Every structure is written in structure tokens, then in C-alpha cells.
Curated annotation (Swiss-Prot):
Gene that this polypeptide is encoded by: RPL32A
Gene Ontology process terms (BP): translation
Database matches in Pfam families: Ribosomal_L32e
Keywords: Ribonucleoprotein, Ribosomal protein
Family, per entry: Belongs to the eukaryotic ribosomal protein eL32 family.
Keyword Ribosomal protein on entry: yes
Keyword Ribosomal protein: yes
UniProt superkingdom: Eukaryota
Protein name: Large ribosomal subunit protein eL32z
GO cellular component: cytosol; cytosolic large ribosomal subunit; cytosolic ribosome; nucleolus
GO molecular function, one term: mRNA binding
Intrachain S-S bonds: none
Organism: Arabidopsis thaliana (Mouse-ear cress)
Amino acid sequence: MAVPLLTKKVVKKRSAKFIRPQSDRRITVKESWRRPKGIDSRVRRKFKGVTLMPNVGYGSDKKTRHYLPNGFKKFVVHNTSELELLMMHNRTYCAEIAHNVSTKKRKAIVERASQLDVVVTNRLARLRSQEDE
């Protein structure tokens, strides 16, 4: 099992959900964020008690950005040949098997990953053990 190269603790500062202003009042206004541009907009003018706007202060530490809590960066893998790319970077990146990969290929990917000493985050997904009767 590869040990992550990252020694710094991964800390997510804040996880505010930025929703579009007035999306809670009107059905036609969806929740996905849009920057308010109106001349009288309370959100744009940053009044107290209104929807928060995303800004630089919500970003995480540059050194730990995109890292998972296990200390690795995620790399989506569809087959064993894509897994070979992680051979030299197994202390920085971990593999995540894509959702549309069959059980047969999943077994091959997990087996090859153990040979290459690459961490697989979802190694048990869709792999069931069958009992012989």
C-alpha cells in the first residue's frame, strides 16, 4: 500500500452553499449560482442577512487543494492501461474506477493496481462475492 507524499493536513475551511438570490422564493429561478448584476441588488451590495456571494476567501489552501482526506489526488480510471500512468505517481494520485466500468474489468483493474502499488478508492464497488451451494 502506497503512503501519501502529502504530509500537511487537508483542511476544508468552509463549505458554504452558494445559491442564487431569490431562488427560494420563485420556482422559475433555479438554485445554480449566477452573479447578481442589478443596480439595486441587496446581494451585490453585500447587505447584512442576505445570500452570501462566493469570493477568494472561501478557497482552500493551495498546497492541499484537490486532495482527498486520505492524502491523495483523484484520477478516474476506465481500464488497466490508464492505470499504468499512475505507476510513477502512486504517492500523489489514487485511482478511482469510473462508474460505467463493468465488473469483469473492475476485477482486472483492482488486481493490476495491487501489483503496481496504487491505491484504489472504490475498490469494493460492484464486486460481490458469490457463495457456492
